[in-house]
From Swiss-Prot:
It catalyses: 5,6-dimethylbenzimidazole + nicotinate beta-D-ribonucleotide = alpha-ribazole 5'-phosphate + nicotinate + H(+). Pathway: Nucleoside biosynthesis; alpha-ribazole biosynthesis; alpha-ribazole from 5,6-dimethylbenzimidazole: step 1/2. It is an enzyme of class 2 (transferase). The active site is at 317 (proton acceptor). CDD domains: DMB-PRT_CobT (cd02439). Belongs to the CobT family. The gene is cobT. The keyword Transferase applies. The keyword Transferase applies. This is Nicotinate-nucleotide--dimethylbenzimidazole phosphoribosyltransferase. Keywords: Cobalamin biosynthesis, Glycosyltransferase, Transferase. GO terms for molecular function: nicotinate-nucleotide-dimethylbenzimidazole phosphoribosyltransferase activity. It comes from the Bacteria.
Length: 351
């Protein structure tokens, strides 16, 4: 494993295919721009896939799981045992992402990077077990440097498996009690923003719980604040194993030329970290939705992202990204299947 592989060159979109796809959109039997953002989505996908008529038939979903030591500060409404129990639910097909992946015909893998209470014999889960969760980041860095590197590499390896399966779109999901706190702490550091502006209820905290979470994050920022300018240090000190894996996956997608569809708040923070590690990866990231967590909007703005959906989602797992896939597919189908003015013998607008 080469150190700092994430700095390697990212693939470039195909400008010729972008031009050809845009020209095709202008010839289709509709007023120019009348399909709104669906037109630009199709054009962007054409450039990224290097095909005038892109398609998204083969989807890959990986849910990365890891627990967080900061739960010891009382920042979550749920116990950490839920993480391992949800892994079982994922592979048995009962979780939201399991249902959605099945409906999409997508491959679904589950990677345990470090649950606090693992179910070791659980078939269908990749057990990497880099740690029994992260350290409590109000007392010490969440991860050691080697742990963080291994978690980044785990995301990269997942994309390699997706590539070997011929996948055209990668969706990363996450599961980990305490990970909205970790994501909010990272966002505060990366955006140089106060916790009060970015912290939300996560899995269901009341107002006093949210205030307590913000205070915990401020303590962590005071401890690790000297490293805010370094995205790797921010990731390892304030992040989580699953967040690092997501960042690694997004970077690998850009390097391999695979489009990544980013899910909610936690995934978007991982994407922001990935872009800070290698800005060129931004072109390969599409953003599925704007979630209910207040910090999500700030992260999306920092990434100049235009999410496809706004449904008040805050589940995670990759579920919001899975919900956006049919929209992307319909953009491709319209782009490829509509007739041009010439083909339909319909009068075009005057030149």
């Amino acid at each position: 494993m080469s150190l700092q592989w994430w700095r390697d060159t990212c693939r470039e979109a195909d400008p010729q295919m972008r031009r050809r796809a845009a020209e095709r959109q202008d010839r289709l039997t509709k007023p120019r721009g009348s399909l709104g953002r669906l037109e630009q989505v199709a054009i962007d996908l054409a450039a990224l896939q290097g095909r005038e008529r892109p398609s998204l038939e083969r989807i890959w979903v990986t849910v990365f799981a890891g627990d967080h030591g900061v739960v010891a500060e009382g920042i979550s409404a749920y116990p950490q045992a839920v993480t391992g129990e949800m892994l079982r639910n994922f592979v048995r097909g009962g979780a939201a992402i399991s249902v959605l992946a099945r409906e999409l015909g997508a491959g679904l893998e589950v990677v345990d990077l470090g649950t606090a209470f693992p179910l070791e014999a659980l078939p269908g889960v990749r057990h990497l077990r880099l740690a029994a969760g992260t350290a409590n980041f109000v007392e010490a860095p969440a991860m050691g440097a080697e742990q963080c590197l291994l978690a980044l590499e785990a995301g990269r390896e997942s994309v390699r498996r997706a590539e070997q399966a011929g996948s055209q779109l990668f969706i990363g999901g996450e599961m980990g009690i305490g990970n909205t706190t970790a994501a909010a702490a990272m966002a505060c550091a990366l955006l140089d923003a106060p916790a009060s502006a970015l912290v939300g209820p996560g899995t269901g905290l009341d107002a006093s719980g949210v205030a307590h979470k913000a205070a915990v994050i401020e303590r962590a920022l005071a401890l690790h604040g000297a490293h805010r300018a370094d995205p790797f240090e921010t990731l390892r000190r304030l992040g989580g194993l699953e967040i690092a894996a997501l960042a690694g996956a997004y970077l690998a997608c850009a390097q391999k030329g695979m489009v990544a569809l980013v899910d909610g708040y936690i995934c978007s923070v991982a994407a922001l970290c990935a872009v800070r590690l290698n800005p060129a990866c931004r072109d390969w990231l599409l953003f599925a939705h704007s979630g209910a967590e207040p910090g999500h909007r700030h992260v999306l703005e920092a990434l100049a992202a235009q999410p496809l959906l706004d449904l008040g989602l805050r589940l995670g797992e990759g579920s919001g990204a899975a919900l956006a896939v049919p929209l992307l597919r319909q953009a491709c189908v319209l782009h490829a299947g509509m007739a041009t003015f010439a083909e339909a013998a319909v009068s075009d607008r005057p030149a």
